[in-house]
Structures are given as C-alpha cells and as structure tokens.
C-alpha cells in the first residue's frame, strides 16, 4: 500500500484492483438498495415521459437515453497510442449526447428533481399516480412550483441537469458552483433564470455552503450529491436500458462473454449508481472500473485508506486542480464509497494531458465530441486483463453542450500533445 500511496502523492497514473470486492450476490445483500428500487425509479421516469416530451420535444418520447456505439477505429488508435492490445470489442456509451442536459448527470439530477416534484404534487392533492403527467406543463403547476426552491452544489454538469429541469417545471433554483466550474455552464443556467452562486473554493465547500443555506430557508429542497439515495437510483436505471441495448445488438453477457465498464468518477454518485445497477443485473459477469484524475483521486484514496469520505486529497498533498472539471472533487461520497468498497473491481487514474489526446483521437477517428472528463474512460480497456470475447464500454459522460470555440481549443491542445507522440 505504501508504494501505491507514494505513487498517488507523486501524481503518478495508478491502476488499482480492489482487494475488498465481494461477489456480486454477497455485496448486494449488504447494500441498502434492491432491484425493486431500480424498477420503481424506472417506472417513475416512465410516468414523467409525457411531461418531458412536452417540455423537451427533442427527447425520444420523453425518455432521456443515449446511444451505445461501437468504436473500432478508436480502439485501433488507443492501441497505437499506448502500444498495447484491447482484447474484445469496444463501445462508447454516449451520454455526451443525452438530451436536455448533455451529460450523464441528466440521469440522476433530473430523476431527483422529478421525484421531488411528484412528492409535492401528491402531498398537495394536485395529481394522482394514474394521471397523464403532461398536464404538469400547465401554468397553474408552474405557479405552484414557484413557491418552492431546489438547490444543489456542483462543479458543473449536475448543476446543469438540475437547474435546467427544475427551472422548466417552475421551481426557483440555486446552483452553488465551485471555482473550477466552467463559465459556459454558468451562462446556460443564468440564461434559464437560475441563480448561480460562485465560490473561490472547491466542490466540497460549494456543497457544504449550499446545504447550510438551504437548511435555513423555507420550502427549499437541497439535492445532496454526497449522500443522495435518489440521485444514486436515478443513475442505476441506466443499467436496465443498457441491458436492452446490448440485447438489441445480439450481445449476451455471461461468464464466457464478460462485460467491462469504465466510468469517470468525481464524488461517485453516477459511477456508483450505474455500477450498482450493472452488478444487480449482470452479477459477476460485469467488471466495473472507476477512473479519476491524478490530481483528484478522492475515491481511490478513500478506498485505499479505508477512511472512505473522511479524507480530502489535500491531506495527501494533492492540489485537486484538473481540466476534468466534473471530476475535480476532493472528498468522495460517504454513501457511494462504502458501497464501492465491496462492489467495484478497481480504479485507475489518468493525467490531464492524456484526456486531451484521447478527446482529439476520438474526434478524428469516430467524429464524436466529448469533454475531457468523458475521455478519461477510454484508456481503461487497455489496462485490464480481458479475453478476446470481452465487451468493453467506455462511458462518455458529457460534451455535446461545449461551445464550439472552447471545444476547438481542447481539440487543438490534444493534437499538440499527440505531435510529441507520433
């Protein structure tokens, strides 16, 4: 462990196999979530589909889902870049194309906003579960929601998903943003009437202050990325949908055809919820790996030290400064760290420079636009020992909303780094 910690402290790229992982059945028996919870979340999203279709006509019948794309040319580019071999097929889960919010956070963030809205409406006798929820778009419901506020702390993408959906329903919205949040993300929110509160400190401080402010206000609901069960379950629904997508492609996951999934990790809610869903469905035939920046490996440190959320990367001399803004988190979620400890297969870390190289290669090889955080998932398939019939899925967490001029800068930066390699 001392070698591992030394490497982490020196900002080295590390690959860690989780020695505490239990079999899926053992782990799931100890976790305070069940398949029924995932199914309930899925049903709630289906109830809201008519409303989402009305508010966001660009969605497919009100279901916010992303394509699963095989990326054979990118597979070759990754092998060429790192001089290794990826055994099996490589797919990209394109949450960078998710409608409404443009990132993986559309799954958990939007789900929790909808659940809160439904709870308020049911408690006030304004709807029943059997109603056509498209009527919630009517002005009288917006007027009702305007008496309530939704708040969240975010480095960017979670704030976007919650801000966009809550504002569309009529809620007042506060988004507490850390110093690393990108200006263009703040602009999207302000353009929708969201109150953006900026901090000079990091993500943990933005969440702490947001939580404190919300607790002191009447009718304010704080979505707590560090501890939220609802966010976690919103993400877990992705596993049900991924299973359907694999079935449509004629892919059956089993012991002979294992599934490897690589998930960028900030505080841990999205990768944690998705891993829980995947392990619930595919059991020990799926292998889940998180990826973090070398400057912000909060989940890795939490699990390696077994201190879980009671650490900050600064405790280890790390600066928590990374271009992967969605992953710039100093302390992991308590809820997720304790689950990941017995559930996930491992974690690897990646340098910022690699993110830009992979971002540029993905654009050149497959014409797919992702943000740096999303590109982190692309190196994983090269690091694990897998067999020839493995299915690898790199989870692209965001990117479609990046303004073109900013994306162009990222792309050119990646190209300049690649010049030194090729």
From Swiss-Prot:
SUPFAM superfamilies xref list: Tryptophan synthase beta subunit-like PLP-dependent enzymes (SSF53686)
EC number: 4.3.1.18
Pfam families: PALP
Cofactor(s), names only, from the UniProt record: pyridoxal 5'-phosphate
Family label: Belongs to the serine/threonine dehydratase family. DsdA subfamily.
PANTHER family, per database record: D-SERINE DEHYDRATASE, THREONINE DEHYDRATASE, MITOCHONDRIAL-RELATED
Name of protein: Probable D-serine dehydratase
Lineage of the organism: Bacteria, Bacillati, Bacillota, Clostridia, Thermoanaerobacterales
Gene that this sequence comes from: dsdA
